[in-house]
Amino acid sequence: MNIIFFGPNGSGKGTQGSILKDKYKIAHIESGAIFRDNIKGGTDLGMKAKAYIDKGDLVPDEITIPMILDRLKQDDCAKGWLLDGFPRNKVQAEKLDASLKKEKMKLDIIIEMLLDRQIAKDRIMGRRLCENDNNHPNNIFIDAIKPNGDKCRVCGGALSSRADDQDETAIDKRHSIYYNDVDGTLAAAYYFRDLAKKDDSIKYITLEGKNALPDVTKELVSKL
């Protein structure tokens, strides 16, 4: 089961990806982690990517896509993989599709999390971190994980928020890229949607991201 997962920051995409990883024993691959692992490991591609990152430049697709393909060939991907965070635009979608076909790597499922942009923004700004345990999710805008006042709903620990979660300009910039359906990330998703219309072996799934986490998971599993 090979999956590409699309969804804006704040949609719960990462959480659902982790659930699929555990349920189906597939690798959950985040594009950012690929860069970090290659740079930390000192690979040729990692060092090339680092040179661009250090200058504040975007890493070219000619470096990024081979890194992704190398990751998809690792042993933990034998039962399948879920790619999260790439492609981010239509051009990357086209290049990734061509590269997967060249490597004879089958793409089975595309998942798109649907979520209103303002709700996504509110969810990001509503995140709170438990100072006792980062694995205790708290969010002032999500009833299921709403804090107890200013304390962690799980352990009663003190809460704080990340600076970048409160940076409206940065959030708006990321969402402008994602919600761009002409050449941004949604355009990448729609490229694969159109591909699925012509290829019955590829399934395109949409999920209502505004629903409660268990309901989203139930909907997702029922559609796979």
Swiss-Prot record:
Entries under SUPFAM superfamilies matching the protein: P-loop containing nucleoside triphosphate hydrolases
GO molecular function: adenylate kinase activity; ATP binding
Residues the record lists as binding ATP: G10, S11, G12, K13, G14, T15, R127, N211
Enzyme class: transferase
GO CC terms: cytoplasm
Complex formation: Monomer.
Protein purpose: Catalyzes the reversible transfer of the terminal phosphate group between ATP and AMP. Plays an important role in cellular energy homeostasis and in adenine nucleotide metabolism.
Protein name, UniProt field: Adenylate kinase
Species of origin: Desulforapulum autotrophicum (strain ATCC 43914 / DSM 3382 / VKM B-1955 / HRM2) (Desulfobacterium autotrophicum)
Phylogenetic classification of the source organism: Bacteria, Pseudomonadati, Thermodesulfobacteriota, Desulfobacteria, Desulfobacterales
